[in-house]
């Protein structure tokens, strides 16, 4: 009798367990149900949250080789909602600095309503980005993408980080990086090409950034010049070039530095820019060959 009783009890336990699992699964939204909710939702922030839930489920079921595609689709889709959010918050963004500065330019505490708004956006993975000339916009923060990036191959994670670190480095034509930070960023691009020589498609995407960074490093920007009014090279930049040559002797950028250090004067900016462009066009560096293959 006991064996039969035990079997009955075991059967009830298993049945109860399956019922609990089915109930739990019913409570967990699937991709189709989330997409149906998304179609009806008009609030950009709530749409971002729904798309994150869809991405969570998609990444769980995707094979490793497919996750990069899932992630790229996700990043494109969420940017649509960020664009709409910036339109919706146009008034707030246009008066962003007025909430923080008085008429004499002194810092003041924003109103509590502004603080609450900004706290809400921060919690939703958004941040304020300064674009220059008093213009700001809402953008997705690194934290928004962090958990997805951690599920991607190392080569893609580094590609993504390089791209992000190169964004908006000179608002108002004023370099926000130090010369050394810019030099090290260029070196990271060159190291990436050596570490992942098979990533030709990503080289194409990185090529324009690499050329721009190299151009700024060698010729400056309108508001961060490489030389003074008399054409003398900025001493800080000269020291940085010398450091870069020593740290990265085999770099294409080092070849440019060696040539530029032989110049007596740095007033002819057009000639310097043309020389950088000429070297970039004739170089066989993988990041530059990728550009010429387009």
PLM features per residue range, with description:
Residues 1-33:
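Bacterial Sec-dependent N-terminal signal peptides
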Residues 25-294:
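Acidic, polar-rich low-complexity tracts and alpha-helical solenoid repeat scaffolds
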